[in-house]
């Protein structure tokens, strides 16, 4: 799943906001009855590489991807693993898009 959202703030400010709020970006919500645990997050320049584990009951699946911050956009590119079988991509995309937009305000 890939989402791109435009912004009009300085790139460094967006990187700082993403880093500060990363855990909140992927935390569980009422729309997603899943517990998300951050396994790894590493910045390389303006690209954040991440690895998460999504757990729903006895089932768990890895989620990995990147968050790339440019001068005008934030792009989240994530492999949702088996997560897509339990939550529609549309729901996951909506929740993640709303959270990134909230982060950019």
Where are these regions (language model features)?
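Extracellular/lumenal and peripheral-membrane lipid-interaction modules
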Residues: 1-105
């Amino acid at each position: 799943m890939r989402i791109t959202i435009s912004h009009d703030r300085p790139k460094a400010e967006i990187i700082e906001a993403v880093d500060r709020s990363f855990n909140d970006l992927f935390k569980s919500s009422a729309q997603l009855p899943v517990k998300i645990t951050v396994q790894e997050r590493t910045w390389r320049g303006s690209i954040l590489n991440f690895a998460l584990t999504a757990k729903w009951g006895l089932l768990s699946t890895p989620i990995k991807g990147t968050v790339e911050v440019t001068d005008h956009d934030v792009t989240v590119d994530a492999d949702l693993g088996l997560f897509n079988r339990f939550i529609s991509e549309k729901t996951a995309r909506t929740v993640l898009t709303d959270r990134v937009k909230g982060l950019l305000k």
